[in-house]
């Protein structure tokens, strides 16, 4: 079915106006973003192809512009629109989290980072920076790649913490294997971070390892 053959009630824009944005499927949302189909395919057909390319919609946030362009019917203009929409959503999410979230326990923090870290194919070392009320004031990925003591240097972590006037930090990294069990390097990095935090007066509240839909809090396990 081509774009001009889609009935009025089936068009994503009309569906949004009649029933609200929540009524749209992921494919329909993408169709609204890319706007047009091709001579031979409707915008919904192309949008559905994009959704099917990824295991879940969350994985789209890690795709490059080249990966989107591998989808038949997607050129640089449409790929750019998709990436812009994803980036805007990420920025809104971060601002909302920073304004509202108080971290009272590891589970509170995991809810913030699990969607971002759980399905990555490389290790990412990520930090939350908190004020004296345990509110998140900033967050950032500090390192990407294999976690070891020579790469994850406390200096880089606490330089940013001092710049943001953080009272404490929580650190996270993912295990692409899905198994969150800590390695000896994980424990060494944690020890060095905790010691550095004591020196500069910024507490390391926890170092949490993220697996596939599960995690391990090194603080809860008594590793530091």
Curated annotation (Swiss-Prot):
Keywords of the record: Hydrolase, Metal-binding, Metalloprotease, Protease, Zinc
UniProt short sequence motif JAMM motif, positions renumbered to this chain: 173-186
Keyword Hydrolase belongs to the record: yes
UniProt-listed GO biological process terms: proteolysis
InterPro entries assigned to the protein according to its UniProt record, in alphabetical order: MPN (IPR037518), RadC_JAB (IPR025657), RuvA_2-like (IPR010994), UPF0758 (IPR001405), UPF0758_CS (IPR020891), UPF0758_N (IPR046778)
CDD domains noted in UniProt: MPN_DUF2466
A single GO molecular function term of this UniProt record: metal ion binding
Domain MPN: 102-224
Residues binding Zn(2+): 173, 175, 186
Assigned protein family: Belongs to the UPF0758 family.
Protein name: UPF0758 protein LMHCC_1020
